[in-house]
Amino acid sequence: MSERRALVTGASTGLGREMARQLAARGFRVAGTGRRERELAETARLVAAAGGECLTLEGSVCEPEVVARHAGAIRERWGGLDWLVLNAGIGDGVDARRFSAERYHRVFATNVGGAVNWLDAVLPWMIEAGHGTVAGISSLAAWRGLPGAGAYSASKIALATLLESTRVDLRGTGVRVVTVFPGFIRNRGVPTEADRGKPFLLDLEDGVRRILDGIESGRPVVHFPWPLSLPMRHVVRHLPPWAFDWLMARLAPRG
């Protein structure tokens, strides 16, 4: 059997499914969470085709009791985890002119609350074992409040800050914490209308390979692709408010 054990949240489609497949190809046993049984079954099929073992866990990361049950199933079957990949996330184009608290709460419940629930369930095992890797998938959108993306940008910087604090707190425990800031990645194997106009868009397979290579690298922070991430991190992130507002007015004019 494979030695390393990984859990990927949000593994029923897109990024999470491809992560599960590629992790299996790298020799991991893989557990994947998701809300839809049929899609999880397809993930399990792809993991098996890549030569791996897959444990599928149906349910929402937003529900602590569901996460606790899933964590118990993993520990009973495998004894623990080596990698916890906090990937589950949703987006919602919430324009402040049509503000919706319900939509904000829904985005935060998945993108932040789901990560908190899994950290609560798994961190004690990793600390006790003296090793493990926690990786959270944030976004380049975390580095500024982008137009029409208030809920998404805010949730992703909340996740990144949570992971940074966790990383500092866990120094000396043997548990690594990695924050990944990817750019645009095609969420399916074929182009869609939603991909139009996204700069430096990466194919799904390539984007996931970069994520996993980054986690394996040992770096605490991973960001890519560099033609987009470097300007975002070192220029746009530090623009004064007047300059940022001027830039956004030209890149995303109000309709």
Residue ranges and their predicted role:
Residues 12-13:
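Conserved glycine-rich cofactor-binding loop
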Residues 26-42:
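Conserved glycine-rich Rossmann-like NAD(P)H-binding loop of the short-chain dehydrogenase/reductase
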Residues 87-92:
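Conserved NAD(P)H cofactor-binding loop of Rossmann-fold oxidoreductase domains
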Residues 95-108:
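Substrate-binding pocket helix/loop in short-chain dehydrogenase/reductase
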Residues 119, 155:
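Active-site helix of classical SDR
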Residues 139:
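Residue(s) in the substrate-gating loop at a strand-loop-helix junction
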Residues 179, 195-231:
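C-terminal helical subdomain
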